[in-house]
From Swiss-Prot:
The protein's name: Serine protease SplC
EC number in record: 3.4.21.-
Residue intervals passing through the bilayer: none
Gene: splC
Residues annotated as catalytic: 75, 113, 193
Length: 239
């Protein structure tokens, strides 16, 4: 039987069971099949690298690039100000590593959608591992370069409220690199803004800024980390 027919049939059944409460397991299985079609998997353990380097915001994603330093998008950081409290650690659960205050926000001076956020090292609310941000996360290293057809992964928090701040990983390939823009076909959704684009060595190539949420789309976009952008980020990493 055609796989698309099977998926659509199960999706219809899932809608029915969600209303009647007959079988919640069918809903979960349907979601798993749909995610498999998109090359998307849920991350079950965020305590290990690279997953412990990807942090959640209320409606987006960020990732750790150095001591007390997070990269996200300008369109994400614009909703925050110095002194705001964020759950900046893996999996979006404040009990996982504490809640932290923003110390500074530095937007890239060009048109590229990059923002560097520095946070206080000590949590204002304590998590089970203590107050220190850097004990709960691991920073990424920059990739030297990237090229078309390289395999990549995107890790983040798509549809965070709907998915209860669960972390997901999607895989794909680079389709185009032009100046500071990188296009790829890994599946993304709202909430993936600020996600790292990683190579096969889990080195960061760029930061996701937008997409069209379509399977196989080659128009999902990230800011490609050129030497100039890397220099800007490096200058804002806390020493």
């Amino acid at each position: 039987m055609n796989k698309n027919i099977v998926i659509k049939s199960m999706a219809a059944l899932a809608i029915l069971t969600s209303v009647t409460g007959i079988n919640a397991a069918v809903v979960e299985e349907t979601q798993q099949i749909a995610n498999a079609e998109k090359n998307v998997t849920q991350v079950k353990d965020t305590n290990n690298f690279p997953y412990n380097g990807v942090v959640s915001f209320k409606d987006a994603t960020g990732f750790v690039i150095g001591k007390n330093t997070i990269i996200t998008n300008k369109h994400v950081s614009k909703d925050y100000k110095v002194g705001d409290r964020i759950t900046a650690h893996p999996n979006g659960d404040k009990g996982n590593g504490g809640i932290y205050k923003i110390k500074s926000i530095s937007d890239y001076p060009g048109d590229e959608d990059i923002s560097v956020m520095n946070i206080e090292e000590q949590a204002v609310e304590r998590g089970p591992k203590g107050f220190n941000f850097n004990e709960n996360v691991q920073a990424f290293n920059f990739a030297k370069d990237a090229k078309v057809d390289d395999k990549i992964k995107v890790i983040g928090y798509p549809l965070p409220a709907q998915n209860s701040f669960k972390q997901f990983e999607s895989t794909g390939t680079i389709k185009r690199i032009k100046d500071n823009i990188l296009n790829f076909d890994a599946y993304i959704e709202p909430g993936n803004s600020g996600s790292p684009v990683l190579n096969s060595n889990n080195e960061v190539i760029g930061v996701v800024y937008g997409g069209i949420g379509k399977i196989g789309s080659e128009y999902n976009g990230a800011v490609y980390f050129t030497p100039q952008i890397k220099d800007f980020i490096q200058k804002h990493i806390e020493q």
